[in-house]
């Protein structure tokens, strides 16, 4: 199962666009996406775990990090590879 964690902030001007892209791709590709605002205890804890210092930031399967607003096509391509078991570096 592919899982995306989107780190956002209420004051971030780019986060609404990132949320829209991630939500659309998650729905259309049938994967789980959660929004973690960094101004909450849970969001901050998770962000620190991944070394995230700016938002928006997207973590996929606790392995892949995309900073900024993700490109819809590239995100969709990565998700399809992960769903197909073609993880980069997998043995």
Swiss-Prot record:
**Entry keyword annotation includes Electron transport:** yes
Give the protein's recorded name. Answer: Probable Thioredoxin
For molecular function, the Gene Ontology terms on record are:
electron transfer activity; protein-disulfide reductase activity
Top-level lineage group: Archaea
- Which SUPFAM superfamilies did the record assign? Thioredoxin-like
Question: What are the UniProt keywords, alphabetically?
Answer: Cytoplasm, Disulfide bond, Electron transport, Redox-active center, Transport
Ranges of residues in domain Glutaredoxin: 1-91
Q: Which GO terms describe its biological process?
A: cell redox homeostasis
What role does this protein play?
Answer: Acts to maintain redox homeostasis; functions as a protein disulfide reductase.
Q: Name one GO cellular component term.
A: cytoplasm
The answer to whether the entry has keyword Cytoplasm is yes
Q: Which family does it belong to?
A: Belongs to the glutaredoxin family.
Q: Which Gene3D superfamilies match?
A: Glutaredoxin
The record's section on CDD domains has:
TRX_GRX_like
| InterPro entries cross-referenced by the UniProt entry | GLR_AS, Thio_glut, Thioredoxin-like_fold, Thioredoxin-like_sf
Q: Which cysteines are joined by disulfide bonds?
A: 12-15
Which locations, inside or outside the cell, does it occupy? Cytoplasm
Sorted alphabetically, which Pfam families does this protein's record hold? Thioredoxin_3
Q: Which organism is it from?
A: Archaeoglobus fulgidus (strain ATCC 49558 / DSM 4304 / JCM 9628 / NBRC 100126 / VC-16)
């Amino acid at each position: 199962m592919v899982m995306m964690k989107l780190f956002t902030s209420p004051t971030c001007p780019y986060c609404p666009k990132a949320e829209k892209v991630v939500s659309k791709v998650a729905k259309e590709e049938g994967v789980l996406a959660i929004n973690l605002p960094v101004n909450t205890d849970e969001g901050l804890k998770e962000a620190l775990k991944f070394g995230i210092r700016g938002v928006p930031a997207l973590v996929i399967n606790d392995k892949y990090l995309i900073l900024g607003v993700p490109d819809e096509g590239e995100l969709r391509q990565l998700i399809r590879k992960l769903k197909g078991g073609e993880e980069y570096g997998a043995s």
